[in-house]
């Protein structure tokens, strides 16, 4: 693990991509802290306020396969521009006076996030050594998780001091990091040749294996998004203040960061399928403990949920990239995009359930979802199968991945 982290620190491009991932995902972490302010300002229900996450996450999700295709064809030199766009559009959210306009800005901001994620993941895959790709991708993904974790704390500080207009300050990190990322990645390769594109498009894809990977990713994203989105609102309903639910939301996400790195290391040793199944099984009691026993004990159970629920996303991302090695940009867009859209759609769905039966019971339903997902995950491809598919396509890897 130390050797792989050292590789990130020595490689300026990897380090800059980590910084960009941290920054773009910090905006995701701010959204749940905005919920209480938006509910009061626009007189929204829980289901309606969840549309903000749907607008942001849905646009990011739907657009990712398209941006992945563009990355396979034209390269990834403009990754920093996507980050800057996200920063500018998100920073204006606190200054609009109508909910439809706010949703429009959330859509625009999500478009920038949708561009950044497949481009960044494709860059990182090409820069990492093959022998520790699971851990390396996990470290990169962890940077985004740390950004999500920092988001609630940043939001609490800014909104506590400036109200909803505090979003204006959020333009600064995105513009600075986006500009630096553009400069660092200026030497990346451009468009691929027509012959390579044609070879990649005609290579057969293991559809069933890819569908299973995407299905597990979608389920995990739903659970992660819902718990991160509604923890602040649930605890406000229970009578707790921002000083309690802000750190609790951050604990939930930081635990995800630790779990991501830990599971990446374990996957390199024991295999990704084994690690994914183990985390799914352990997630069921973790969800029940978190929802049945709210209060100060939630900091301990939040660590369990965070560690288990979000930790396997980079493993599934790498699986998809290897299953579609000659179209890794599209693979990144598909697995992350469909995962994003499920998480985004899941927030208003659970919000509607919460309006009917309460937030606590709404969150508890995810124990059932995880049990169903265990059955799906049983059909995940084994390491030798993934490597075989990857080897068949590795010679057709596109030039955007070359350094």
Where are these regions (language model features)?
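Extracytoplasmic gate region of multi-pass secondary transporters
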Residues: 31-32, 209-253, 257
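Central cavity-lining transmembrane alpha-helices of secondary-active solute carriers
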Residues: 54-67, 250-262
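Cytoplasmic helix-loop-helix junction between adjacent transmembrane helices
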Residues: 105-143
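Helix-loop-helix hairpin linking two adjacent transmembrane segments in secondary transporters
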Residues: 139-186
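C-terminal transmembrane helical hairpin of 12-TM major facilitator-type secondary transporters
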Residues: 273-316
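A late C-terminal transmembrane helix in Major Facilitator Superfamily
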Residues: 326-356
């Amino acid at each position: 693990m130390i050797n792989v982290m050292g590789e990130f620190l020595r490689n300026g491009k990897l380090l800059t991509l980590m910084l960009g991932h941290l920054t773009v995902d910090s905006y995701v972490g701010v959204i749940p802290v905005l919920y209480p302010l938006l509910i009061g300002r626009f007189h929204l229900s829980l289901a309606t306020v969840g549309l903000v996450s749907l607008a942001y996450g849905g646009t990011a999700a739907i657009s990712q396969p398209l941006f992945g295709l563009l990355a396979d064809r034209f390269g990834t030199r403009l990754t920093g521009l996507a980050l800057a766009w996200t920063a500018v559009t998100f920073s204006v959210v606190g200054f609009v006076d109508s909910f439809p306009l706010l949703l429009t800005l959330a859509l625009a901001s999500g478009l920038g996030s949708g561009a950044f994620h497949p481009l960044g993941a494709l860059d990182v895959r090409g820069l990492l050594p093959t022998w520790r790709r699971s851990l390396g991708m996990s470290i990169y993904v962890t940077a985004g998780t740390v950004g999500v974790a920092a988001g609630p704390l940043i939001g609490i500080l800014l909104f506590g001091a400036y109200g909803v207009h505090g979003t204006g300050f959020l333009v600064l990190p995105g513009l600075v990091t986006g500009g630096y990322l553009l400069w660092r990645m200026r030497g990346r390769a451009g468009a691929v040749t027509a012959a390579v594109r044609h070879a990649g498009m005609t290579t057969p894809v293991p559809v069933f294996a890819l569908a299973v990977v995407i299905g597990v990713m979608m389920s995990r994203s739903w659970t992660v998004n819902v718990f991160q989105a509604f923890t602040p609102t649930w605890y406000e309903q229970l009578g707790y203040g921002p000083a309690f639910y802000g750190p609790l939301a951050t604990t939930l996400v930081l635990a995800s960061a630790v779990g991501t790195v830990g599971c990446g290391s374990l996957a390199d040793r024991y295999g990704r399928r084994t690690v994914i199944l183990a985390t799914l099984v352990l997630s069921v009691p973790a969800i029940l403990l978190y929802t049945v026993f709210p209060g100060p004990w939630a900091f301990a159970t939040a660590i369990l949920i965070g560690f288990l629920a979000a930790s396997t996303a980079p493993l599934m991302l790498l699986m998809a990239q290897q299953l579609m090695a000659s179209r890794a940009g599209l693979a990144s867009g598909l697995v992350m995009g469909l995962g994003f859209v499920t998480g985004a759609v899941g927030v208003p769905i659970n919000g509607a359930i919460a309006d009917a039966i309460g937030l606590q019971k709404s969150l508890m339903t995810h124990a059932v979802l995880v049990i169903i997902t265990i059955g799906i995950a049983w059909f995940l491809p084994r390491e030798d199968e993934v490597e075989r598919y990857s080897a068949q396509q590795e010679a057709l890897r596109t030039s955007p991945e070359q350094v």
